[in-house]
């Protein structure tokens, strides 16, 4: 990436080659760089600042529900990982192992954490004794390693940043309540802050997390019609508790197993932001997540008083995340650069504007230009940012709804998947064989059984037997 030509060169059209468009945007918006290890990326300031804002927003929401942050080691002894059979089998192909340390072979291999259930379970088994110790509501921000065969920045990398919450409860009801609570927290965050509408639902048994009783998911639809799993919340029941002997003494002085949950979100969300809102000029960031909400571009900045006025304007706009671009680049270059980086509002101000006590505001998403009095500029920018946030969500929801189809037969299902990228709603009998057959024949996977169930047919779209659930299907990242 360092050897790329000019940042503001034209990027591949998303309609021509969506995958290349995505790569171009990631490169030219300077979000990440490639490292010397295949599948590992370096977060550049522009990319990491988005993740910092995601962290800040989510962390506050977690803590409002009573969650506390902790940090677990990155290494897991092999014997500990092997304690929960389904869990280890689910992750075995992706695990990275440390076999040597300090120049010597280790007596026991250490796994570089792909996820931390086993560490939290081992910890809980030592600190939970009584019902008075419950619930335990812990979260950690860290990186994990999964040895993926194919990788793409943000969407699938060997090492990625995430948060993983792990809770322990006295009853099954409390655990289920927490599982759903966190899923809804995720969905609300995505819709309110990232302006990405979500389908909330339950994964099929085939798609659920290894070792979980139930996995709930939020699914988003990208601009190219592919789905992106954007956050998951798992109810483990007492399965892990039995494997790790996590017991507590209840009020009747009887030993009981705890019921557990885990839930996580990752830097995939940045990929979702790019693919839901981006256009052929680069990123388009919703104001609430944008590291810089307003950029001031002085015109003819070497003229007397222009930079001083820009600095004065920055102070006036202190309620927003604002920067002045006083670099030596031309105004046209700066416009393209800030469009590429998705900054929501650009303020243009030059000698004639100063004389007229005005500035020009440009919205990133619609390119709409507004001439506004400097006396009212802070109010007007606030209105633009609020409108932009709301309208970006509406556009994304309209796009998703326009690309959500129904199928009532195998032939119709295959035709929709082949010719109409998007979500496909179809009834399902509940049998894994049908799920496997649909994937084999069409490449579509079950995304979720939505909480908002509909009855669009009596029979399974695959086998024709009595249907049990409506499922959202689709090709996915």
UniProtKB/Swiss-Prot annotation:
| Name the record gives this protein | Proline--tRNA ligase
Q: Which NCBIfam families match?
A: proS_fam_I
Q: How does it assemble?
A: Homodimer.
State any GO BP term from the record: prolyl-tRNA aminoacylation
One GO cellular component assignment for this chain's record is: cytoplasm
Q: Which PROSITE patterns match?
A: AA_TRNA_LIGASE_II (PS50862)
- PANTHER family, per this entry? BIFUNCTIONAL GLUTAMATE_PROLINE--TRNA LIGASE, PROLYL-TRNA SYNTHETASE
- What are the alphabetically sorted keywords of the record? Aminoacyl-tRNA synthetase, ATP-binding, Cytoplasm, Ligase, Nucleotide-binding, Protein biosynthesis
């Amino acid at each position: 990436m360092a050897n790329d030509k000019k940042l503001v060169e034209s990027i591949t059209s998303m309609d021509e080659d969506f995958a290349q468009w995505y790569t171009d945007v990631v490169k030219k918006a300077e979000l990440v760089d490639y490292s010397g290890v295949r599948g590992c990326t370096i977060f550049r300031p522009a990319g990491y600042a988005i993740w910092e804002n995601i962290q800040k927003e989510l962390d506050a929401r977690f803590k409002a529900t009573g969650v506390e942050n902790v940090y677990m080691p990155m290494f897991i002894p092999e014997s500990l990982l092997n304690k929960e059979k389904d869990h280890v089998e689910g992750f075995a192909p992706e695990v990275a192992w440390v076999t040597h340390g300090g120049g010597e072979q280790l007596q026991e291999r250490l796994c570089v954490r792909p996820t931390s259930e086993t560490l939290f379970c081992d910890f809980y088994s030592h600190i939970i004794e009584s019902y008075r110790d419950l619930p335990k509501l812990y979260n950690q921000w860290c990186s994990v390693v999964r040895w993926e065969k194919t990788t793409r920045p943000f969407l699938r990398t060997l090492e990625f940043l995430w948060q993983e919450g792990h809770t322990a409860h006295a009853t099954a009801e409390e655990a289920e309540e927490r599982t759903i609570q966190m899923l809804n927290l995720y969905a609300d965050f995505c819709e309110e802050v990232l302006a990405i509408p979500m389908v909330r639902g339950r994964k099929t048994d085939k798609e659920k997390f290894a070792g979980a009783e139930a996995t709930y998911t939020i699914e988003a639809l990208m601009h190219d019609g592919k789905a992106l799993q954007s956050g998951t919340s798992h109810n483990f029941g007492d399965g892990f508790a039995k494997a790790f002997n996590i017991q507590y003494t209840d009020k009747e002085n009887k030993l009981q197993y705890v019921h557990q949950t885990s839930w996580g979100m990752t830097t995939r969300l940045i990929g979702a932001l790019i693919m839901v809102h981006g256009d052929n000029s680069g990123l388009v960031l919703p104001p609430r997540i944008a590291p810089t909400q307003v950029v001031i571009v002085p015109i003819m900045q070497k003229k007397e008083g222009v930079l001083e006025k820009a600095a004065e304007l920055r102070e006036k706009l202190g309620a927003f995340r604002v920067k002045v671009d006083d670099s030596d680049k031309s105004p046209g270059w700066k416009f393209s650069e800030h469009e590429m980086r998705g900054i929501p509002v650009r303020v243009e101000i030059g000698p004639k504007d100063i004389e007229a006590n005005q500035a020009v505001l440009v919205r990133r998403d619609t390119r709409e230009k507004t001439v506004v009095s400097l006396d009212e500029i802070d109010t007007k920018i606030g209105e633009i940012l609020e409108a932009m946030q709301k309208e970006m969500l509406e556009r994304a929801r309209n796009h998703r709804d326009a690309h959500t189809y129904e199928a009532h037969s195998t032939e119709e299902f295959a035709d929709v998947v082949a010719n109409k990228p998007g979500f496909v709603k179809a009834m399902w009998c509940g049998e894994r064989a049908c799920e496997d057959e649909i994937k084999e024949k069409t490449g579509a996977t079950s995304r979720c059984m939505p909480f908002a169930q509909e009855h669009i047919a009596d029979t399974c779209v695959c086998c024709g037997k009595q249907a049990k659930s409506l499922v959202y299907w689709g090709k996915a990242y």
